[in-house]
A protein has these predicted regions:
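Active-site core of glycosidic bond-cleaving carbohydrate-active enzymes
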Residues: 1-268
């Protein structure tokens, strides 16, 4: 959205150098390597920065090989840790969600290779294996959003789950995918849900994007810019789980900012 940004290039380059050994997952999470591939491809598509891309291509090709090694010939995912986001960490939807992220990464890589005139045979092999699966999502909205961006469509049942209870069940990390998928059928509804979700953050004093947020947290809780009143919940200290329990929950986190891309695409 902003042309070439040095901080973006340095961050992606840093992660490549930090995890340069084949088989080393970023932050021990295989899907982070997939997101790295997606980010590098998208950044090049938006900027045409060939000098930056040239530094990444060797490592990117290694990721394709690594993904192929981690997906069985029958389509089984053999990654050590499957991760979509924290709200799905203990839910079975993280398995199919990780597959969707892998499909998105493979498709972005294929588009990149095609533009550069490179052989896509290994990517095609990876995609063929990844498609050997029942693509059904049980209930998680963020995984339905990933399904749309991986496959290009969702079922009517998927859509019904996606819009059920409006902003309830949204994910900060996957906000772009959830809202974009809703907008593919009902742009105005997607914008309303965005306003309900991020507006609730603003109502609680947010000035930056929060690491995680559940609309239910707003019930009986105070704002972050003052101490809780007697009987109020502390929306910062009393919520969160996994690695961000209590005050470890970041109130300024980039992975919640996907809504900016949604606004740029749908709210002009």
């Amino acid at each position: 959205m902003y042309g070439r940004v040095g901080a973006v290039e340095k961050s992606l380059d840093f992660e490549r150098r930090r995890h340069k050994y084949k088989g080393k997952w970023m932050c021990s999470l295989s899907t982070y390597n997939m997101w790295w591939v997606i980010c590098v491809c998208e950044y090049y598509f938006m900027t045409g920065a060939k000098d930056f891309l040239g530094k990444q291509m060797g490592y990117l090709a290694e990721q394709i090989d690594l993904f192929n090694e981690s997906v069985g010939e029958n389509g089984e995912l053999k990654y050590e840790c499957l991760y979509v986001d924290w709200p799905t960490m203990d839910h079975e939807d993280k398995i199919i969600g990780s597959r969707f992220i892998n499909i998105i990464a493979a498709k972005k890589a294929k588009e990149l290779y095609t533009r550069l005139g490179l052989d896509t045979a290994e990517i095609d092999r990876l995609l063929a294996k990844l498609m050997m699966s029942d693509m059904k999502v049980k209930e998680k909205k963020q995984v339905i959003g990933l399904k749309y961006y991986a496959l290009g469509s969702i079922t009517d049942d998927d859509y019904a789950l996606l819009i059920k209870d409006g902003a309830s069940g949204l994910s900060t990390f996957m906000s772009y995918f959830i809202l974009g998928t809703i907008a593919s059928r009902d742009k105005e509804l997607a914008i309303k849900i965005m306003k309900d979700y991020y507006g609730a953050m603003l109502d609680k004093g947010a000035t930056t994007f929060w690491e995680d947020f559940d609309i239910e947290w707003t019930i009986g809780s105070g704002r972050i810019d003052r101490l809780p009143k007697p009987g109020e919940k502390d929306i910062h200290g009393d919520f969160g789980k996994y690695c961000y329990k209590g005050f470890r929950h970041s109130l300024c986190h980039a992975w919640s900012s996907g809504v900016i891309k949604f606004i740029e695409e749908y709210c002009k």
